[in-house]
Amino acid sequence: MAKKKTQNSNTIALNKKARHDYFIEERFEAGVSLAGWEVKALRAGKGQLTDSYVIFKNGEAWLLGAQIQPLPQASTHFVTDPTRTRKLLLHRKELTKLKEATEQKGHTVVATALYWKHHLVKCEIATAKGKQLHDKRQTEKERDWNKQKQRILQTNQR
């Protein structure tokens, strides 16, 4: 009898810090232009999105700050730069919408997730507005209060 394959998650990397530092407003799915060694490294789980963001140059979107560590068995015939800028593949309407969002004061575009969709690597990017220190404290208070409410409800149901 054949063994069942373990169900792997499609998520490669998450940017949890983005949810802490920004108010996430609108999300978009973008393709990522990668080299062969980068795809192989992502299959091994070597991707990281902490402090990654999107810039716009010449009508194109570029992902900065994303790190993909090369595998030790990667070819030595070319330079493997873990933090190189990677082109994001978006439709023209999405590009203009994102560019307009970044022109507002305090808004930026950050990468929130990197995942597999069929055999392709996709990057979830989002327009975001920066949080100030008191905003971060407020969300933490709300989170703690929600946990306390759940505990109270569970003890009352017993």
Swiss-Prot record:
Residues covered by region (Disordered): 131-158
Compartment list: Cytoplasm
Database matches in Pfam families: SmpB (PF01668)
Keywords: Cytoplasm, RNA-binding
Annotated GO MF terms: RNA binding
Biological process, per Gene Ontology: trans-translation
InterPro entries found in the cross-reference section: SmpB, SsrA-bd_prot, SsrA-bd_prot_CS
Classification via NCBIfam families: PRK05422.1, smpB
Family affiliation: Belongs to the SmpB family.
Protein name: SsrA-binding protein
Lineage: Bacteria, Pseudomonadati, Pseudomonadota, Gammaproteobacteria, Cellvibrionales
